[in-house]
Swiss-Prot record:
Native source organism of the sequence: Encephalitozoon cuniculi (strain GB-M1)
Listed name of the protein: Glycine--tRNA ligase
Keyword Kinase: no
Enzyme Commission code(s) on record: 6.1.1.14, 2.7.7.-
UniProt keyword annotations, A-Z: Aminoacyl-tRNA synthetase, ATP-binding, Ligase, Nucleotide-binding, Protein biosynthesis, Transferase
One BP annotation, GO: mitochondrial glycyl-tRNA aminoacylation
UniProt lineage: Eukaryota, Fungi, Fungi incertae sedis, Microsporidia, Unikaryonidae
UniProt catalytic activity: tRNA(Gly) + glycine + ATP = glycyl-tRNA(Gly) + AMP + diphosphate; 2 ATP + H(+) = P(1),P(4)-bis(5'-adenosyl) tetraphosphate + diphosphate
Subunit structure of this chain's protein: Homodimer.
Family statement: Belongs to the class-II aminoacyl-tRNA synthetase family.
CDD domains recorded: GlyRS-like_core, GlyRS_anticodon
Molecular functions (GO terms): ATP binding; ATP:ATP adenylyltransferase activity; glycine-tRNA ligase activity; protein dimerization activity
Length: 579
């Protein structure tokens, strides 16, 4: 397996301001980082390719939603009760530790046995009781050698209060997905009630890590790019699966680890449906196009005790780095769990219409609100009441309706300061469509992790030990640098023209005016991963020619200054190959 010089890479990242610890002048904050110009530029380019590869290619509906969510939303989604890690305390110093990390590290230091190997495989999924038993069994101590407390659950969400009086409990969102589920009804209407369709969202998510570590891999604030593909349970074939079915990938599944095509994975039932297989294939193509080493990429199927009870299947795209195999993308078939939870929690009907092959007769509740009475009482608020009543789900009505006599039923609804009693009755009718809650297949991308893995995979040392990042031109923080051997005023206008042409075409261009040798200028740009360097030299004054140097081969060509910008643009866009 390839080795990475983690220390040297992280040294360069800090020296060249790819990344720095947040508030470093005050000593920094664990688990929070700021991106400098090159780091942010690479992240922007990753997201640009992600949008092109997924959102534009698949006609996804991209939305932006708030980073703060009310308690009720996250209670319904299960995050208030279940978004937890297990922690333990040093009984002497009071230091706290994430239990699975502490136990895992301790077991790895012990003499390997079959039993310890089995414990390591399930440490991520252990309950508090199982953690306590392992700590006792192997006499695991804190990093200071002290006895550990009993383990306990720790909710990972950041909570706050909003408003002058702090009356409403809010949380920083633990994932971008919830905003998409909350807007499902509007997204469905926007898409003319047609299924399947996919929405997408890019933004910050937050996780109050017990013990952040591994740089960008485990942080308290991170960027996510998430897709929610809404599809009917029995219609998970994908019309474009044939475009990825021949891709061979390393799949670690329940039975074995093997390299097979996605077509074979579907036929053998290893991957549960074509839509899931399609997103696995598209994810692999995206990561490889970014510059991730194909040999250091695998897809691992979640173990049954690792997967949520409602999930029908879950795969992680894992990338090998100096920290080992790290999960960078999760692709899960979440069934109809999320929308069902929010329908129950909000009391709003989140079903969509599905045309039936044959009409059928159904019974449903019909509400009869006294519009005259409540219109007079509520005036401007009456339209809001009507929207609330019309949005009530059949499931909610069925659960809360009360019989008040023979063939008479009543539903009580709280609205503002009123309790409104609404008569309701069961009505039979013939329908040509049915209301269903779709399933969701969710590819979730951890952008910070992908960024770090890409940085490691792009790093190498030349024979003279000079460091280089071999970022692809479309991903590099700066696509082209311009410099000179000796400065002459005659260069200025041409440098400006080249820079303007390239920046007008969406490229990032850096003019290197350092007073140092051209070799040092090249090395400085190699450390940033800049693929092309245009050099003006004294001969330009005679022949109007400049030199283009390519980063990885270090080869140079001389071209006419007027043709130079378009030649560089072709190389960067991949329309011409350097040879």
């Amino acid at each position: 397996m390839r080795k990475f010089d983690q220390q040297q890479i992280e040294q360069i990242l800090k020296k060249r301001f790819f990344i720095t610890q947040s508030a470093y002048i005050y000593g920094g904050v664990s688990g929070l980082y700021d991106l400098g110009p090159p780091g942010l530029s690479i992240k922007t380019n990753i997201l640009s390719l992600w949008r092109k590869h997924f959102v534009l290619e698949e006609d996804m509906l991209e939305i932006e939603t708030t980073t703060m969510l009310p308690h009720d939303v996250l209670k319904a989604s299960g995050h208030v009760d279940k978004f937890c890690d297990i922690l333990v305390f040093d009984e002497v110093s009071g230091d706290c530790f994430r239990a699975d990390h502490l136990v895992g590290d301790a077991l790895e230091k012990m003499s390997p046995t079959e039993e310890i190997s089995k414990e390591l495989q399930k440490v991520d999924c252990m309950s508090c009781q199982e953690i306590d038993e392992i700590i006792s069994k192997y006499n695991i101590r804190s990093t200071l050698g002290n006895k550990l407390s009993k383990s306990q659950q720790f909710n990972l969400m950041f909570g706050t209060q909003i408003g002058y009086k702090g009356g409403q409990t809010m949380f920083l969102r633990p994932e971008t997905a919830q905003g998409q589920f909350l807007n499902f009804k509007k997204l469905c209407e926007y898409n003319n009630d047609k299924l399947p369709f996919a929405s997408a969202s890019i933004g910050k998510a937050y996780r109050n890590e017990i013990s952040p570590r591994s740089g960008l891999l485990r942080v308290r604030e991170f960027d996510q790019a998430e897709i929610e593909h809404f599809v009917l349970t029995d219609e998970k074939d994908h019309p474009k699966f044939s475009t990825v079915q021949g891709i061979k990938l390393k799949l670690m599944h329940h039975d074995a680890s093997e390299e097979i095509t996605l077509k074979e994975a579907i036929e053998r039932g290893i991957v549960c449906n074509e839509t899931m297989g399609y997103y696995i294939g598209r994810t692999a193509l995206f990561l490889i196009e970014l510059g991730i080493d194909r040999e250091l990429l695998r897809f691992r199927q979640h173990k049954k005790d690792e997967m949520a009870h409602y999930a029908k299947g879950c795969w992680d795209a894992e990338i090998y780095t100096s920290y080992g195999w790290i999960e960078c993308v999760g692709i899960a078939d979440r069934a109809c769990y999320d929308l069902s939870c929010h329908e129950d929690g909000s009391k709003v009907d989140l079903r969509c219409k599905r045309r039936l092959a044959e009409p059928k007769e159904i019974e449903e509740w019909v509400l009869k609100l006294d519009k005259k009475e409540w219109g007079a009482k509520l005036r401007d608020r009456f339209s809001v009441l009507m929207e609330t009543v019309n949005g009530l789900s059949q499931k909610y009505i069925e659960k809360n309706v009360v019989s008040i006599g023979e063939n008479r039923n009543r539903l009580s609804v709280k609205f503002d300061e009123y309790t409104i009693n609404i008569e309701c009755s069961r009505v039979k009718k013939k329908v040509f469509v049915e209301n269903v809650i779709p399933d969701v297949i969710e590819p979730s991308f951890g952008i910070g992790r992908i960024l770090y893995a890409l940085i490691e995979h792009s790093f190498y040392l030349r024979e003279d030990s000079r460091p280089v990042f071999r970022f692809k031109p479309a991903i590099a923080p700066v696509q082209c640098a311009i410099g000179y051997l000796i400065h002459f005023d005659e260069f200025n206008e041409h440098i400006l023209n080249i820079k303007r042409f390239l920046t007008d075409n969406g490229l990032v261009v850096h003019v290197n005016e350092r007073s140092c040798s051209i070799g040092r200028k090249y090395s400085s740009c190699d450390e940033l991963g800049i693929p092309f360097f245009i050099t003006f030299d004294p001969d330009f004054l005679k022949d109007r020619m400049v030199t283009i140097r390519e980063r990885d081969s270090m080869q140079q060509i001389r071209v006419d200054v007027e043709k130079c910008p378009s030649i560089v643009l072709e190389y960067i866009r991949g329309q011409s190959r350097w040879n």
